[in-house]
A protein has these predicted regions:
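Short, acidic, metal-binding catalytic loop of nucleotide-sugar glycosyltransferases
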Residues: 1-8
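Structural recognition of the beta-strand scaffold that forms the well-ordered cores
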Residues: 12-13, 102-105, 119-121
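Catalytic phosphate/metal-binding cores of nucleic-acid and nucleotide-processing enzymes, i.e., regions
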Residues: 12-15, 37-39, 95-99
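Active-site-proximal specificity loops/subdomain of glycosyltransferases
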Residues: 16-74, 83
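Conserved glycosyltransferase catalytic-site signature
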Residues: 60-64, 89, 157-162
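Conserved donor-nucleotide/metal-binding helix-loop-beta segment in metal-dependent transferases, i.e.
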Residues: 83-116
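Catalytic core and acceptor-binding pocket of nucleotide-sugar-dependent glycosyltransferases
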Residues: 108-115, 122-188
């Protein structure tokens, strides 16, 4: 990731491991100790969020927590196993240059939702209409935490994207740069 985006970016990994799982805890520790651009976050101890213990929240929604962090100004949401392409880097650079609050990428015919859970970004240091983007995100989280889908079963498919569509997209749509190879004219 840093080869394409640069050393200033930090990868944040949210995890839920028992302290008794020494092998995996050791692997996480080794990963963090050998990579100074990785921030490990135990979802049972999340300071600065409306939920200190996020174990009941659908795991794919954990990756949205940086939107509540006052130390985060720019945030990209990707799956851990995603490969970053030069095309994506160019799209992100275009979005960052725009000053817009949200970035959404859809690059496959099956990407038929406004915001893919693992292909979007947020600028928290900008305005989103008449409010700051941070304020918009706090409001979104207030409604996200009241939505039963936020607490979906771990094996569920798509609750993260539905949450973004319901609670973020209504305000983000007009504040977004969208890169869409297939569906833009039809859906959004």
């Amino acid at each position: 990731m840093t080869e394409l985006y640069g050393e200033d970016w930090v990868m944040r990994l949210y995890y839920d491991l028992e302290p008794s799982d020494q092998q995996l805890m050791g692997q996480l520790c080794d990963l963090a100790c050998t990579n100074n651009n990785i921030d490990l976050c135990n979802i049972r101890q999340l300071p600065g969020t409306p939920v200190r213990d996020a174990t009941e929240i659908f795991a794919m929604n954990w990756r949205f927590f940086p939107t509540l962090d006052p130390q985060v100004d720019i945030y990209l949401c990707r799956d851990l196993d995603s490969r970053v392409s030069e095309r994506e880097v160019a799209a992100v650079e275009e979005w960052l240059g725009s000053g817009r609050a949200v970035h959404s990428m859809r690059d496959h015919p099956a990407h038929n939702t406004p915001v893919l859970g693992a292909a979007w970004g947020a600028r928290l240091d900008t305005e989103a209409g008449a409010q700051s983007a941070r304020s918009r995100w706090r409001q979104s989280w207030a409604s996200i935490l009241r939505d039963n889908l936020t607490y979906a079963e771990r094996g569920s498919k798509g609750p993260d994207q539905t949450i973004l569509t319901r609670h973020v997209w209504p305000w983000a749509r007009s504040e977004a740069v969208q890169h869409d190879s297939y569906t833009y004219a039809k859906l959004y």
